[in-house]
Amino acid sequence: VGVIGAGYWGPNLIRNFTACPHTEVAAIADADADRLRAIGERYPQARLCASVEEMLAVPLDAVAIATPVSTHHRLASACLDAGLHVLVEKPLAASVEEAESLVALAAERRRVLMVDHTYLFSNPILAIKRILDQGELGDLHYIDSVRINLGLFQHDVNVVWDLAPHDLSILDFLLGTQPLSLSAQGCGHASPTHADVAYVNLDYGDQRMANLHVNWLSPLKIRQMIFAGSRKSLVFNELNATEPIKVYDRGISVDPDPSSVWRQKVGYRTGDIWSPNIEPAEALQAVVSHFADCIRQGATPRSDGQLGLRVVRLLAAANQSLSQHGVRVPLDQGALFDVCHA
């Protein structure tokens, strides 16, 4: 495996590919000579490459790309054209058009294209999926997600493109359906061209919706999702290492007054709270192992190019709504909007 990018995320990929029994890091590429030299001291077995072109001369089976999103299409296209399987950091590409191009190229070359949506391989998210699939919560009413912190500011994308891919990929994986439309509002304080605070609302129809709050300006770090159902509700607090998931037997019961269509009796139910046992494990290790297994077995990745494309479509629609001050965007229109700045 070759890894392109040794900045923030690349070293994590290199560490996990090195630990995986089915992979070996044979090459590392980065344009920063000092950074490349430093990572090379930790992984002397890997050939150090100053460019992607130099890396493509090394015998490889696959490449992982951990570079800014604006470079994903060019780098992934070059690797797929060279006959390599590709794992690319989220989001898949900077536009719907670029994402569609990569999905088509991977299919044409018959190569695995996988997006590193790490949460889909985390034990808490897998546990939530089991709970939802078993009907523990009843009919899902709404999902609230808060993903806020002070930073880290990105130079090439806004806060929606930086943080919302986590939530959008989680919703895609857990719900198995796409929203009918979305709206987004936000503003940029550090830069007028990049929103650093944003709110995204997704309408799934049948009185189901999801609300996402993403923020680079919060004094507090919060990583929390609430799944509210007709029977029970679930809270996922990523920062709670011991009990990240809590299921609440709390809710309401509505008894319509038969004498008037305008009157209803609302009752409140308070029951037990329980937390499933979640085995601690590094999700990124599961990502690289899954990538290797898909290559060896010819299988479709859990977070394949199609899922990555669906996420990019939603991001593009959110940008369209942001640029129009929160107008609701049907997703067939949002898919056509392909600028990743707002």
Locate each region found by the language model.
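Beta-loop-alpha module in the N-terminal Rossmann-like domain of NAD(P)-dependent dehydrogenases
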Residues: 13, 43-104
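Glycine-centered short loops/turns at secondary-structure junctions
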Residues: 83, 110, 135, 207, ...
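Short, Asp-centered acidic motifs that coordinate Mg2+ and/or phosphate
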Residues: 27, 62, 142
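N-terminal Rossmann-like dinucleotide-binding module
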Residues: 1-43
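C-terminal glycine/acidic-rich active-site capping loop/insertion
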Residues: 20, 118, 231-302, 327-331, ...
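Glycine- and charged-residue-rich phosphate/anionic-cofactor binding loop of Rossmann-like
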Residues: 24-27, 293-311
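Rossmann-like dinucleotide-binding domain that binds NAD(P)(H)
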Residues: 150-220, 226, 240, 306
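A contiguous active-site-proximal alpha/beta segment in oxidoreductase catalytic domains
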Residues: 93-155
